[in-house]
A protein has these predicted regions:
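Alpha-helical linker/hinge and terminal dimerization helices associated
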Residues: 86-108
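Helix-turn-helix DNA-binding motif, specifically the short coil turn and the N-cap/start of the second
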Residues: 49
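Short helix-boundary/capping micro-motifs
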Residues: 33-41
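A short LG(V/I)-centered, amphipathic sequence patch enriched
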Residues: 62-78
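Residues within the DNA-recognition helix of helix-turn-helix
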Residues: 56
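Short, Lys/Arg-enriched N-terminal segment that forms or immediately precedes the first helix
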Residues: 2-18
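Short alpha-helical "packing" element that flanks the helix-turn-helix/winged-helix DNA-binding module
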Residues: 29-30
Length: 115
C-alpha cells in the first residue's frame, strides 16, 4: 500500500482572543477575488455563501492585523498590497513545507527499500 504525506500551513496570531486563521481556504478565496474582482463572485465560484466568504476575510484581516481587500461597493473588491503579499508568503512557506516533506519521504522510502 502506498501513502502520501501532506501538510497544510495555517498562520494564526499568538493572541488566542483573535478569531480565525489564515490558511489554504483563505488563500483560494483571495486568489478568486484577484481573478473575479469581486468577493461575491469569488465566493460563488467556490460554492461558498457570501456571508461565509465575508467572515473568512474579516477573520483573516483580524489575525494578520491588516486589510487584505479593498471593498468598493458596487464596483467590487480588489486585493490590497498586503493581500497580495499574504498570498505570496503563504505560497512560499507551503512550497518550503512540501519540499521538506518530499525530501523526508524520499529518505524514508530509500531506507525502507534497503531493509
Amino acid at each position: 500500500m502506498e501513502y502520501k504525506t501532506t501538510a497544510k500551513l495555517v498562520i494564526q496570531a499568538c493572541d488566542k482572543d483573535l478569531p480565525g486563521v489564515f490558511g489554504h481556504g483563505c488563500v483560494l478565496l483571495l486568489q478568486g477575488i484577484a481573478r473575479e474582482h469581486s468577493l461575491n463572485r469569488a465566493a460563488k465560484s467556490m460554492g461558498m455563501a457570501y456571508s461565509k466568504a465575508w467572515r473568512i476575510v474579516n477573520e483573516a484581516e483580524g489575525q494578520l492585523g491588516c486589510k487584505l481587500i479593498e471593498r468598493d461597493g458596487a464596483r467590487g473588491s480588489t486585493l490590497t498590497p498586503a493581500g497580495e503579499r499574504a498570498i505570496e508568503v503563504y505560497e512560499e512557506l507551503q512550497a518550503d513545507i512540501n519540499d521538506i516533506i518530499a525530501t523526508k519521504a524520499d529518505a524514508s522510502s530509500l531506507a525502507s527499500k534497503s531493509s
